[in-house]
Amino acid sequence: MYYRNDLKFYIMLKLQAETTLPTDFGNFKLLAFSEKEEDWMPHLALIAEGTELDTVTNIRIHSECITGEIFHSRKCECGQQLDAAMKYISENGGIILYLRQEGRNIGIINKIKAYQLQEKGFDTVEANLKLGLPADDRDFNPAIEILDILGVDKINLLTNNPEKM
């Protein structure tokens, strides 16, 4: 459901769970946000230890990438980008918003099909379009809503794609 008087579209996420997560990069607070507690794919926020949320906050919005983050695929740099963001935010404070929208939000099965087309010479956008899918179907409204829930209103957005801003 989407609502909001100020024209922002919200999904009505709620904080469902949180814990401290020790990582190779330092300690983070891990928070899970979803509409319902039983949602098995919540959006996640990793907040570096010592982060002040009432000042300008470093933010990295990262979309899930199973092939790059878990299997270290050479077809993308997502795993390396996430590692670099975790290192930077651990050292400088901030939040990583991990949005559950695999393969530009086309899902893992369609992403595998797109990979197969890439083996035939198509790039990512061409492969998605050939499959009848959008070039990029990601929705960043959950990131806005999570930042709103956390009370963050001044950000320094960390990106490797400034042309997408």
Task: Write out the residue ranges for each language-model feature.
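Catalytic domains of riboflavin
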Residues: Y2-M165
